[in-house]
Amino acid sequence: MPGVRVKEAEPFELALKKFKKQCEKAGILSEVRKREHYEKPSIKKKKKAIAARKRALKKQRKMID
């Protein structure tokens, strides 16, 4: 869990920036978006297969160039 200790002379904006960076590194926002709506396992599997196919095509195109 990200947390930031704010020093007396430290501006709030800087502390907020540090907190946002820690949240991004921890992957909290992406996890929240992912869990916002329930996704059936079959749909997850389809999306995973489509992503794998896209990666393979991209890799293949890169090899040709």
UniProtKB/Swiss-Prot annotation:
InterPro entries: Ribosomal_bS21 (IPR001911), Ribosomal_bS21_sf (IPR038380)
Record's protein name: Small ribosomal subunit protein bS21
Single GO cellular component term: ribonucleoprotein complex
Pfam families named in the record: Ribosomal_S21
Family: Belongs to the bacterial ribosomal protein bS21 family.
GO biological process: translation
Keywords, ordered alphabetically: Ribonucleoprotein, Ribosomal protein
GO molecular function: structural constituent of ribosome
